[in-house]
Amino acid sequence: MRTTNRPERACAKPAAFILCATALALSACGGLRAPAGTDAAASPAARTLATPLADGRTAEGGVVDGFMFAEKPGDVAIDPVSFSSGVARATGVIEPRHGSTWGGIALSTALQRGGRALDAGSARTLAISLASAGSGVLRVRLVGPNTALRDSGCYPVAMVRVDPELKEYAVPIASFTPESYCGANAPAGAAAAAALTAVEVADAAVTPGRRRQVDFKVGVIRALP
């Protein structure tokens, strides 16, 4: 089951591999952007992909959307997403009373107006500000425009260990891989980055018989050369 204000799509079980991403100190290059009308392939500089605003949009023209997903109805509940300048916060509860073996709560940040794709294929690293008070691991997914891949949960993911305090983590694009159940046609990180519509972050840890609070934040997202 999945609840969102966007069209319904299937959601994937978490990957087994967990990436220990490097926490970056915020630097002066964080404010750099590619010139208007260009894409990441044309710019060697760091590029800001999304800066959450207090109204749920991003400064770059995208939007942040929260949703929940579960194997069985009633095992996950999401609260309204809260926003402040630079940060989106997702909260809720995962409680597999009905037997779900997978499920979670997610924030999806669309990067451009109308869900248009951008080319971040020249980037080597996704820098993303994250925090989690409810789980030490968050799943980050690169999402593209292919509906079949999106609905099957076969865009690539990286599992990132995070702290309760908001920090910027450097996640190598090469570390994003498709879930194990996806076929050979599922894209890896570089291919997904070349046609990127959204970045999805999820707390997708389910423990049988355990009720758990979810509380995580997503901040600025950047592509680094």
Where are these regions (language model features)?
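Bacterial N-terminal signal peptides that target proteins for export
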Residues: T3-I18
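Residue-level signal for mature regions of secreted extracellular proteins and peptides
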Residues: T22-A23, T147
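C-terminal motif of bacterial Sec signal peptides marking the signal peptidase cleavage site
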Residues: L26-A28
